[in-house]
Amino acid sequence: MKLTVTLPTHSYDLTIETGALDKIGTWVRSLWQPQRVAIITDETVNKLYGAAVEKELQAAGFETSLIAVAAGEQSKSLETAQLLYDFLAEQQLTRSDGLIALGGGVVGDLAGFVASTYMRGIHFLQVPTTLLAQVDSSIGGKTAVNTKKAKNLVGTFAQPDGVLIDPNTLKTLEPRRVREGIAEIVKSAAIADVELWHRLSSLENEQDLVAHAEEIITACCKIKRDVVEEDELRSEEHTSELQS
């Protein structure tokens, strides 16, 4: 399934397909000409998918480099962003090259922020691997890092060139990560999609949801797309959480 996010300045597609990660090289080649590509991921996701993703990209003609940050919220910081800037500079990435965010919401926020600020902005792609990131945070262009004073205090709005969602990645998620995504799905269904609400009500457990993930993720992405198209900058949202 392919959905288009249509915006005044930059439109892009959400590709939702079981097994899509196995063809990531072909997908990226459809968006970019062969060039240098930096992959930002975390240590957990790297062990699962890093080598395979690099192999696919190289087979499609891309020159790749990969950096894995520590998994978890602690990596969503200005200090980690600085490490990533240094890495991109060492790899000699220019504005004609690209960056891929491979991971959950932390990686997506962090990599998107780095891509939007490195050399005043380079092209990037989102490849979310958690349910929450697939139905929410990878779509819409919000990027941010935390500071000691607040969560999401420093950030940008920067739209990716595309989003690739492979429901197969949910099979390696911890149950609590699946539940985090389910909470967002339930919220979306309650607010905007009665049919999705009834569909969720018919599921027996988390495993049942994962088995029907492509259908459910697609429904949620349609909701998120509509929200983003209506108000790209979500001007009424307040996403920073000040710390005392």
Please place each PLM-identified region on the residue numbering.
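ATP/NTP phosphate-donor binding region
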Residues: 1-98
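A glycine/threonine-rich phosphate-anchoring loop and its flanking beta-alpha core
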Residues: 15, 113-206
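Generic structural signal for well-ordered, non-membrane alpha-helical segments
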Residues: 21, 46, 50, 81, ...
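Non-catalytic interfacial helical region
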Residues: 85-102, 111-126
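Acidic-aromatic/histidine active-site loop/patch
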Residues: 105
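Catalytic nucleophile loop
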Residues: 108
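Active-site segments that bind and position negatively charged phosphate/pyrophosphate groups
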Residues: 203-240, 244
